[in-house]
Amino acid sequence: SRCTHLENRDFVTGTQGTTRVTLVLELGGCVTITAEGKPSVDVWLDAIYQESPAKTREYCLHAKLSETKVAARCPTMGPAALAEERQIGTVCKRDQSDRGWGNHCGLFGKGSIVACVKAACEAKKKATGYVYDANKIVYTVKVEPHTGDYVAANETHKGRKTATFTVSSEKTILTLGEYGDVSLLCRVASGVDLAQTIILELDKTAEHLPTAWQVHRDWFNDLALPWKHEGNPHWNNVERLVEFGAPHAVKMDVYNLGDQTGVLLKALAGVPVAHIEGNKYHLKSGHVTCEVGLEKLKMKGLTYTMCDKSKFAWKRTPTDSGHDTVVMEVTFSGSKPCRIPVRAVAHGSPDVNVAMLITPNPTIENDGGGFIEMQLPPGDNIIYVGELSHQWFQTGSSIGRVFQTTRKGIERLTVIGEHAWDFGSAGGFFSSIGKAVHTVLGGAFNSIFGGVGFLPKLLMGVALAWLGLNTRNPTMSMSFLLTGGLVLAMTLGVGA
């Protein structure tokens, strides 16, 4: 699965009868949804971008100077003048120079002098700013079912589907082939202040240099460089790249301050680099909160017969995935398609299956299958696939796993924020409380009661509530009632 290859992975486990789960997706992360009686699904935020954003200012990094002219007057002869002074795109400077008999003046003193130079911008020496429009930013969400096929990190799963969202998008339904349909309703949120963000892009001149950065609007507008708006042929403040020398009689030198690319690159050190792909300008941060509908998902292969246990061989022996799960792959030499008999037992309990399958109902197909992912309790375990067996020690502790999943649940609820609550009606408010409980405690509940059936969990919740009602000690009564209520809420809830 896609999530197996990513470091930032989260699990959301639906309770009995789950039809909807709420996910928080961020760039670089991936969420695996597991629910009883449903295929597992990976969901991730693949990209945030805008196509062809609007240009704001263009800056010139290297001036192109031509047609230098100088005019001078003797003392008392009035100001020197050039017609170029009134022309757009020309830089001029007035000054006073020493005049006398040696440079063709009858009087000694200060005479007027003016120098002008035509200024443009060198080719491929511009820095352009682009602004985002929040209404046009596209959020790409991808969905991939766990099919039992091993897919390398650099390969694309044939069952992968894509949904795109903007601020005005409605619910999207994706068809996952034999696994049914999944619906997505996502609320989008950028991770940056778009009103204060500019993408600064340089003309491409060197392959080893980055070409775009994500900068603050005020910093961009304060750049001391010649600038213009798109479509305007003339540059403003072009004198910032031109220097005039000291006047000498009838001569005034004009200097080009040179290429400012190096100065700009030095100023951009440490600034986030922006990614541009064709006409797509990508944002580096942001998230979407998605409500995923699972009601039309269906398990594949439930009617298959069980595979012959003696005809399996390891293709990839069990390996730690890095996400507190174990992954493996087997080959099968018997009749296909069929269901893979897989289980795991803990040390000292040979009759209890402790494996929680992330790949539900693993199968061998005519053209693939055999990849299995499972979660095991900490400690010594034995994994069985048919007649194959493998000793496995799962690191960590049950308590640590509970705290970790609870922490992630709190993070998810924090990111969802105000959208997690509905104060419009009493029913909506209590539904919001239930959803919040599932979001925060769903992972911990599954870690503790993952191998317990629906009826035992229901009876346990009722028993704890009954004890709470019949206990005289107020503290113990409240503790039993609270614990029993949580167990019943997590067991009977239909949302996560």
Curated annotation (Swiss-Prot):
Residues carrying covalently attached carbohydrate according to the record: 154
CDD domains recorded: Flavi_E_C (cd12149)
Keyword Transmembrane helix: yes
Any Gene Ontology CC annotation: host cell endoplasmic reticulum membrane
GO molecular function: protein dimerization activity
Chain ranges passing through the membrane: 448-468, 480-496
Cytoplasmic topological domain: 469-479
Disulfide-bonded cysteines: 3-30, 60-116, 60-121, 74-105, 92-116, 92-121, 186-290, 307-338
UniProt cross-references to Pfam families, sorted A to Z: Flavi_E_stem, Flavi_glycop_C, Flavi_glycoprot
InterPro entries: Flav_gly_cen_dom_subdom1, Flavi_E_Ig-like, Flavi_E_Stem/Anchor_dom, Flavi_E_Stem/Anchor_dom_sf, Flavi_Glycoprot_E_cen/dimer, Flavivir/Alphavir_Ig-like_sf, Glycoprot_cen/dimer_sf, Glycoprot_E_dimer_dom
Keywords associated with the record: Clathrin-mediated endocytosis of virus by host, Cleavage on pair of basic residues, Disulfide bond, Fusion of virus membrane with host endosomal membrane, Fusion of virus membrane with host membrane, Glycoprotein, Host endoplasmic reticulum, Host membrane, Host-virus interaction, Inhibition of host innate immune response by virus, Membrane, Suppressor of RNA silencing, Transmembrane, Transmembrane helix, Viral attachment to host cell, Viral envelope protein, Viral immunoevasion, Viral penetration into host cytoplasm, Virion, Virus endocytosis by host, Virus entry into host cell, Zinc
Gene Ontology BP terms: clathrin-dependent endocytosis of virus by host cell; fusion of virus membrane with host endosome membrane; symbiont-mediated suppression of host innate immune response; virion attachment to host cell
Protein name: Genome polyprotein
Species whose genome carries this gene: Louping ill virus (strain 31)
